[in-house]
């Protein structure tokens, strides 16, 4: 999934598709199977993407999509007068622009953004998935001392789980 940059895999049996596996399925499996193994170093801020992409709320959806593609990310924070006022994600773009047949070059981000979900960076990683599930989102804005310090995605969480529980538990070596 990671090497192909996809979030869903078709499961086949005898050349027939029998199911669909999502990155969210992996995160749920690892989180609830091994949550007792989380230690002090497994804090959200350690694994959050620190490069914070921002764009003005009056920019177009097309411009935001271009920036997200250029940086290979699934979200961008939206600001107004240097304050973060929203977040635009791939899912939001597809649901509010593409599915509605709108021209991305004429859609302002202020009309498609969501209110960002915030999570304290000092919390353990299992709280990140709980927060995502509770709010039905795949991207959470990480804060430290009431300031935005990064963004963590379901993809980041899955990569963390893979390293933590596949490598560390199988080989006894820390990540």
Predicted regions and their residues:
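The conserved cystathionine-beta-synthase
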Residues: 1-5, 12-13, 54-72, 79, ...
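Short beta->alpha transition motifs characteristic of CBS
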Residues: 6-10, 17-32, 73-77, 84-99, ...
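Short N-terminal micro-motifs specific to bacterial/archaeal maturation
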Residues: 17, 52-55, 84-85, 103, ...
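Residues in well-ordered alpha-helical elements
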Residues: 24, 62, 91, 110, ...
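Juxtadomain coupling helices with adjacent low-complexity linkers
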Residues: 25, 30-43, 53, 127, ...
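Bateman (tandem CBS) regulatory domains
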Residues: 39-52, 106-116
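Conserved small-residue-rich
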Residues: 42-102
């Amino acid at each position: 999934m990671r090497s192909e940059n996809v979030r869903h895999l078709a499961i086949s049996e005898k050349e027939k598709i029998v199911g669909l596996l999502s990155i969210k399925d992996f995160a749920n499996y690892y989180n609830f199977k091994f949550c007792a193994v989380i230690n002090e170093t497994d804090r959200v801020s350690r694994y959050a993407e620190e490069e914070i992409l921002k764009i003005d709320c009056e920019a177009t959806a097309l411009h935001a999509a271009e920036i997200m593609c250029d940086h290979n990310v699934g979200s961008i924070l939206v600001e107004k007068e240097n304050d973060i006022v929203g977040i635009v994600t791939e899912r939001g773009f597809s649901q509010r622009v593409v599915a509605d047949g709108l021209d991305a070059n004429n859609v302002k981000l202020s009309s498609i953004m969501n209110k960002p979900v915030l999570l304290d960076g000092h919390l353990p990683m299992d709280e990140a998935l709980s927060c995502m599930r509770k709010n039905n989102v795949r991207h959470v804005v990480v804060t430290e001392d009431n300031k935005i310090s990064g963004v963590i995605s379901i993809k980041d969480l899955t990569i963390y789980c893979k390293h933590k529980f596949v490598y560390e538990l199988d080989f006894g070596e820390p990540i």
